[in-house]
Swiss-Prot record:
A GO CC term assigned to this protein in UniProt: cytoplasm
Residues covered by region (Interaction with tRNA): 151-153, 307-308
Main subcellular localisation: cytoplasm
Disulfide bonds: 105-201
A Pfam family the protein falls into: tRNA_Me_trans_M
Keyword field: ATP-binding, Cytoplasm, Disulfide bond, Nucleotide-binding, RNA-binding, Transferase, tRNA processing, tRNA-binding
GO biological process, one term: tRNA wobble position uridine thiolation
CDD domains the UniProt entry points to: MnmA_TRMU-like
Keyword Acetylation part of the UniProt annotation: no
Entries under HAMAP family matching the protein: tRNA_thiouridyl_MnmA (MF_00144)
Record's protein name: tRNA-specific 2-thiouridylase MnmA
Marked site positions, Interaction with tRNA: 130, 339
Gene name tied to this protein: mnmA
Enzyme class, UniProt record, top EC level: transferase
Source organism of this protein record: Leptospira interrogans serogroup Icterohaemorrhagiae serovar Lai (strain 56601)
Amino acid sequence: MSKGKIIVAMSGGVDSAVTAGLLMEDGYEVIGVNLRTWEYEAPACDTTKKSCCSPEDIRDARDVGISLKIPFYVIKMEKVFQEKVIDRFIEDYQHGKTPNPCVECNTFVKFGALFEKAKALGIDKIATGHYARIARNGERYAIANGIDVGKNQAYYLYGLSQENLKNVIFPLGEMTKPEVRQIARRMGLPVADKSESQEICFIPENDYRKFLEKKNVEFTPGFFKLKDGRIVGKHKGRENFTIGQRKGLGIAWKNPLYVISIEDDGSVILGEENETYNESFSVIDLNFQGLAPLNEGESLECRVQVRYRHIPIRCKITKMKEGLIVHPLEDVRGVTPGQSAVFYPLDSDYLLLGGIISKGSIQMRIVEPAISVLN
């Protein structure tokens, strides 16, 4: 007996292809959908590179649909992608932040807009090839880490709503990448050995500066300064820098210097390694998953992850009128405005909540310089 219809977001890669195949084997009536998010003929896009969502990927997704004998459609998402991902990406850099477009894409395009399309077709369920799982904490749903540590994508999925989480399936959450490729070969899928994308889909070669230039973004020149206000050089645009950056500064100093703050007036503040640790920071634009929303003034000890490959550390969070104040209980450095922070329980691997690290909330503290490795 059929388990009903389900839409599978098919990127053209092996993960989404296996997702579709597994759901078919499990009794679902699978409809494959590819989300066209970017005008690939645009001069900013070099389709010869390994970026996701290219015309080649659309062809590969269609070939998988033919191989599995399922309906396949391409849905135009350029407008919502432009508004929710690209425009915000540009705006964040113009305000001295370092954005994470993959988070916005997952929240507003891959899930938000796709669920709207599914409901318009009378379909409740969607599935993707993310390496993540769904957990329950009482009455609340949450993203939980996939078992493949190297591929775990929970960090990018904190923006999913409770309604999204009730109706999404992640068949690969309990698998490793080698297992997925083995299944693809068993199914005879044409993308079984296809290499993975290595770039942001609209940023060829990950050269965001070139992308901003092609979008006619005006860079904000200014001075390199130390924390005490001393000017140690000039730069051609704060958009060229990110928190924690060491290379490419062009400043001769007795010790290596790092970017520790990017100011509204265009100043880029530099400090030595022992000035890069974070005493506290704030997080805004919160989305609660496994944790019910906190009331203003409530506090909680948990763990925080401040970038994709960061190992979560213990912290104390306090709910403020707008957002959270986070006090790390272990050393952390390079906390970057515009990036996302996600929070886990002390003893479990599901997401409590997540949000955007806010500009203007970074306070530096002096620690022993022996600690020199970015988590």
